Amino acid sequence: MSDNAKPIIYGTTWCGDTRRARRFFDENKIEYTWVDIDLDKEAGKLVEQINGGFRSVPTIVFPDGSILTEPSTRDLQLKFNIS
């Protein structure tokens, strides 16, 4: 990914953890790309590959190559140095 790439949030519209993660990004004005794995089957396969066969959401892939799966709000705060 290029230096100006955005994090990619893979999730579903019905998942509370996904909604919470997206709300965190929105409230902190962090740009991201949203991918609904219920609509994008290839993305769903990627999430399964990342998570050992599980469709764990949200799965967030960052431009630096790091990945957070089902992160807590605190995990996201630490990732972005937000207290």
Feature locations, PLM:
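Thioredoxin-like thiol-disulfide oxidoreductase module
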Residues: 36-54, 66, 81-82
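Conserved segment of the thioredoxin-like fold in thiol-based oxidoreductases
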Residues: 22-38, 55, 67
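Local sequence-structure signature of Cys/Sec-based thiol-disulfide redox active-site neighborhoods
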Residues: 1-30
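Non-catalytic, surface beta->alpha helical segment in thiol-disulfide oxidoreductase systems
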Residues: 62-83
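Loop/helix-junction capping segments adjacent to catalytic residues or to phosphate/diphosphate-binding pockets
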Residues: 15, 41, 70
